[in-house]
Every structure is written in C-alpha cells, then in structure tokens.
Amino acid sequence: MPYLLEMKNITKTFGSVKAIDNVSLRLNAGEIVSLCGENGSGKSTLMKVLCGIYPHGSYEGEIIFAGEEIQASHIRDTERKGIAIIHQELALVKELTVLENIFLGNEITHNGIMDYDLMTLRYQKLLAQVSLSISPDTRVGDLGLGQQQLVEIAKALNKQVRLLILDEPTASLTEQETSVLLDIIRDLQQHGIACIYISHKLNEVKAISDTICVIRDGQHIGTRDAAGMSEDDIITMMVERELTAIYPNEPHTTGDEILRIEHLTAWHPVNRHIKRVNDVSFSLKRGEILGIAGLVGAGRTETIQCLFGVWPGQWEGKIYIDGKQVDIRNCQQAITQGIAMVPEDRKRDGIVPVMAVGKNITLAALNKFTGGISQLDDAAEQKCILESIQQLKVKTSSPDLAIGRLSGGNQQKAILARCLLLNPRILILDEPTRGIDIGAKYEIYKLINQLVQQGIAVIVISSELPEVLGLSDRVLVMHEGKLKANLINHNLTQEQVMEAALRSEHHVEKQSV
C-alpha cells in the first residue's frame, strides 16, 4: 500500500546553516506520527517545507503526497491537496463568528451571493465531527482556548483535510480539554485522516502516537513504533544524553520562616460577589520549594498575583515577611520586599518581543547601572547582560537580537535572568516550563535546585502534577479558591493530590513542622 506522505532527503539551508539536513519522513493514511525534538531541532522548518510556507525551489529533496509530487509555491497549494497545519498561535479572527471563521476563504456562494443556509448545514456537520455544540453566530473571541482549538480543526475539515498537522495543540489547554482533543484526533484517525503531532508533553505523545520520529540538530535520529518506546527512550534520542533524573533532587535544607500569608481573600475584578481566593493562609521557609497544585480556576495564580501586587481586583489579608507585616499593592513594592516573579503568560506579561534580549534582561534593574545619576553605564550593563546570558545558558546569536525571535525556553531563561538580577529572597514561578522542550526544562529544574541551596525560597505553580511533585518539598492543594490541603512531599502521588483537590469539604491537612 503506497504511503500517503513521503518526504525524501529534505535539506533546507539559511545562509551557511543547515536547519534541516537530509531528513526523510513518511506516513500512511490514518496514521498518527509524533514529531519530537528540542526547540531549534528543525521540526518547525520541516513542517514549513511540507506546507509550502518555504516554497519549492528553496529546499532540496522531494515531497510526494497521495502519489503525486508536490511543488508548492504557497500554503494554499498544499491546502488544496488536503494538508492543513494548526499552529500553537491559533489563526482565528477573534472578532468574527465561528461560522465566518470556518468558511473564511472557502465561502459557499450561489450566483455570487453567500449561501448561509448551505453553510449553516455544513457548519452543523463539521461541529458534530469535533464534538462541539455552539451557535454559528457566537463570536470566536468569546470562546475558551479549548473550543477555539476545535474550531480550527473544524476549519481544516472544511478544506477536506487528509493530513492534519498539530503544533503544540495542548500548550494552553486544561487536562479535560486535552482529553477531548486527543479523543477527537483518534476519531479522525478512524476516518482515515493522518496526523503529525508535535508536542513537548511526552505523556501525550505516548498516548496518541502510532509512530514517533525524533529530530536533533536538523537531522533525523530515528523513527520507531510508539508502543516500544518509553519516555526515557524519547528523551535520550532528543538530547543525546540520559537524564537519569528529570527532576534533580539535590539535598537542600530549609531555614526559618520567611513568608506568611494569613486569611487572604481576593474578589473578581468586575464582580465583587465572586471570590477568586477564599480565606487562604500558608507559610514559606527559606530554601524551600513550595508547590501549588489545583485545577484551572483553583485560585493559584490569583493568590500569587496578590502576593506580587498585580492582582487587578480587590483583596484583603495579611502578608508577613521576616515576621513583619508588609503592605504590597504593586510589583515595585513586592520587588522592594525581595520578591520576584516569572509570570504565567511570558508572551503577554514577561517579555517585550521587539526589544533586545539584553534589554529584556536588565529591564527591571536599570538602577544597578546608573550609579545615582540619570545616565546609564552602558559598559556595566553590557557586562551584566553577557554574564546573565552565560549563567542561564540563554541561546542567542546576539544580546541585541529581538527576544521574540528566541525559542520559548530561551525566552523563559531570559526572564529568569531578569528576576535573578533583582537578588530576590522569594522567587515565584508560575507555569515555569509551559511550552518549552525537555532540555530547557531540565536546565530550569537544575537552576531551581541551585537557588534553594543558596537559601532562596521558591513558589512553583504548575498545571503539570508530575512537575509539582518532582520539584516541591511541600504542596498546597487549592480548589475553587480555597486551600484544601497542605502536604509534606514524602513520595506524594498524583492521586493523593487530586483526591485532596476534589474533596467536597474545606479541610486543610496538618503539615509537619
């Protein structure tokens, strides 16, 4: 039986650099292939070649789809063949309705007039295929990210897709939304639709894939049956080394209490009747890693936003640092108290994309380079930038490169470098490894361990329970704004954490002292 897709000996160069070096990939109709590799390995370049974003003639090699050679000059050419790609940054127009987005560029017309009756009938069939029940007049911007992802798939199905490429489709989805998406992909597979799945979440890769293809440094390392591979096998192929412990568990001792929060309550910024955080109290010791776990909407991010002075609504409660009550109502006051934070959404809140990597690093600590005068000491700033880039292993061709051009992992390391310039005593990490590859994750985990060995207290908020359990000395479990458990991490399991989160009563387990 002929393959649906064959990419033969693809090579793509940028100047003297080979981004893709003689890579081949093939898959059958209805097959799900996961494409794995660190950021910068060449995955995205290979997919851009396949989709016509890099046109025929700009690369070497051959692409055969459904028995015919593709020589695409534009992404529309491959879409007509039945190839569709859905990027991590969704390509929906938020101000248009769901129906308008699905048919954008593929409108059904009759005598030059759009036939809304036919489009509505087609719309209902498409949404049934992705298990959505939404009015066609609903504005896309009013949907959650999980629903928007399914609208993108429905849009692809409207183009008679035969090969669906999903690039980090669950990076911003909840576990429930992820489960729905994976079920839909499996259902599409039963209808003969093939899928190339790109994700850093190896548990998803294992769960969804028939075959796993690994690319490293632009080269094809190997393609194997998913059933015969463990997550450790995938990691070793990706990074060319064994990460014997993904979560470095280097010994560190905790000191005395540095932070205490008492009876913290925060209200919705618009609706004062809704409590986003409800009477939460906890403490933190020097050199301790405190994890905060809970489902989406649990109040984790809202809690630490109050601590850092950036919660947009009203809140009340008491914050003590070194036993002294402090008033923190903005981020500058938090920084003055020795608190730094890596935000949940790095693109929205963590970086200035068009600004240089170096300037992003020093952005919050410019007073270090003024020496009491208004003029910056450029030499001192540049020295600090280079030291930070080296210390955090930020991969960039130049400190002057716009940070928006870096991979997610390197953007995150630059944000961490900025935080460390503030000499924090308390470091808050909200989703510290979201959307970054396993190698960058490992480096960040090692850094966290180094920081607590220096006596810095760290708070980690993560939607990935294995990450919380792998890093934390102690775990707070939140649900619907309430603190449900305060657990010492003596071989805690995911089941124990979820059980604590979903208890109907408000019960805080007593912690060891």
From Swiss-Prot:
It is an enzyme of class 7 (translocase). Its EC number is 7.5.2.10. Disulfide bonds: none annotated. Residues 5-242, 259-505 form the ABC transporter domain. It is found in: Cell inner membrane. SUPFAM superfamilies: P-loop containing nucleoside triphosphate hydrolases. Its main location: membrane. One of its GO terms (molecular function) is ATP binding. SMART domains: AAA. Keywords: ATP-binding, Cell inner membrane, Cell membrane, Membrane, Nucleotide-binding, Repeat, Sugar transport, Translocase, Transport. It is a peripheral membrane protein. Pfam families: ABC_tran (PF00005). It catalyses: D-xylose(out) + ATP + H2O = D-xylose(in) + ADP + phosphate + H(+). One of its GO terms (cellular component) is plasma membrane. ATP binds at residues 37-44. Belongs to the ABC transporter superfamily. Xylose importer (TC 3.A.1.2.4) family. Part of the ABC transporter complex XylFGH involved in xylose import. Responsible for energy coupling to the transport system. The complex is composed of two ATP-binding proteins (XylG), two transmembrane proteins (XylH) and a solute-binding protein (XylF). This is Xylose import ATP-binding protein XylG. It comes from Shigella flexneri.
